[in-house]
């Protein structure tokens, strides 16, 4: 127990199913065993691995190497974990950027559709306003035409009455003289025109004007002769 360093023989057992070596209850992979073999000094027979079976090392050295290899494996696992986390974060950022671009594209499309809808609505309002103005103007022109036709009809009625009155006066004054109807041809034409254009008497205004001029001229001539 004094000055001699104690050594213990440790047997490496292989797991046939998983290629795992068990050292004193610790399961080591083949990669860990290979690295432990490579890091062992080549001159020391007590610390060399000659094969998977029958190799012996000191207990303390074995614990140290196992701890180092486990720490290395843990570091590699942590590094791989961090790498995968980084990939996941990068993928999430890419997915978020793609979603943002898609959202913006959909928003632009909605804005464009809304602008087109507003333009179409504005154009429809303009067309409705133009149609309303045209209907109003049409009603105004029809009203003016009706008034002109009414005035023309009244004018014809007054002229006819005046002519009849003048004719009666002349007949009473000059009974002994034989006379013929004044402006008979124009009277016939204007009567015929009014019969043919009962809804558009304004078209006979030119004949009515000629007829009135003819009647006035006849009256003046009769008065001059009678005087």
Curated annotation (Swiss-Prot):
Keywords of the record: Acetylation, Cytoplasm, Disulfide bond, Lipoprotein, Membrane, Mitochondrion, Mitochondrion inner membrane, Myristate, Nucleus, Phosphoprotein, Repressor, Transcription, Transcription regulation
Domain of life: Eukaryota
Summary of the function given for this chain in its UniProt record: Component of the MICOS complex, a large protein complex of the mitochondrial inner membrane that plays crucial roles in the maintenance of crista junctions, inner membrane architecture, and formation of contact sites to the outer membrane. Has also been shown to function as a transcription factor which binds to the BAG1 promoter and represses BAG1 transcription. Plays an important role in the maintenance of the MICOS complex stability and the mitochondrial cristae morphology.
Stored InterPro entries: MIC19/MIC25 (IPR007964), MICOS_subunit_Mic19 (IPR052632)
Residue ranges of every copy of the CHCH domain listed in the record: 180-222
Short motif (Cx9C motif 1): ranges: 183-193
Keyword Transcription regulation appears in the UniProt entry: yes
Keyword Signal: no
PANTHER family in UniProt: COILED-COIL-HELIX-COILED-COIL-HELIX DOMAIN CONTAINING 6, MICOS COMPLEX SUBUNIT MIC19
Annotated membrane topology: Lipid-anchor
Intrachain disulfide bonds: 183-214, 193-204
Subunit structure: Component of the mitochondrial contact site and cristae organizing system (MICOS) complex, composed of at least MICOS10/MIC10, CHCHD3/MIC19, CHCHD6/MIC25, APOOL/MIC27, IMMT/MIC60, APOO/MIC23/MIC26 and MICOS13/MIC13. This complex was also known under the names MINOS or MitOS complex. The MICOS complex associates with mitochondrial outer membrane proteins SAMM50, MTX1 and MTX2 (together described as components of the mitochondrial outer membrane sorting assembly machinery (SAM) complex) and DNAJC11, mitochondrial inner membrane protein TMEM11 and with HSPA9.
Gene designation per UniProt: Chchd3
Lipid-anchored residues (N-myristoyl glycine): 2
Protein name, per record: MICOS complex subunit Mic19
Motif (Cx9C motif 2): 204-214
Pfam families: MIC19_MIC25 (PF05300)
């Amino acid at each position: 127990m004094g000055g001699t360093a104690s050594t213990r023989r440790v047997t490496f057992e292989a797991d046939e199913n998983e290629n795992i070596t068990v050292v004193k209850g610790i399961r080591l992979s083949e990669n860990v065993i290979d690295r432990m073999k490579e890091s062992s000094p080549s001159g020391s027979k007590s610390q060399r691995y000659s094969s998977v079976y029958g190799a012996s090392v000191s207990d303390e050295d074995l614990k140290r190497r196992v701890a180092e290899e486990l720490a290395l494996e843990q570091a590699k696992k942590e590094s791989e974990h961090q790498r995968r986390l980084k990939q996941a974060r990068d993928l999430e950022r890419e997915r978020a950027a793609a979603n943002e671009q898609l959202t913006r594209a959909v928003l632009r499309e909605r804005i464009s559709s809304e602008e087109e809808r507003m333009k179409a609505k504005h154009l429809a309002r303009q067309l409705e306003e133009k149609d309303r103005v045209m209907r109003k103007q049409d009603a105004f022109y029809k009203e003016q035409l009706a008034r002109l036709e009414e005035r023309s009809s009244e004018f014809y009625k007054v002229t006819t009455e005046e002519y009849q009155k003048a004719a009666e006066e002349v007949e009473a004054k000059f009974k002994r003289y034989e006379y013929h109807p004044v402006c008979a041809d124009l009277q016939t034409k204007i009567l015929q025109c009014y019969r043919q254009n009962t809804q558009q008497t304004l078209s006979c205004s030119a004949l009515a004007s000629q007829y009135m001029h003819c009647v006035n001229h006849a009256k003046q001539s009769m008065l001059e002769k009678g005087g």
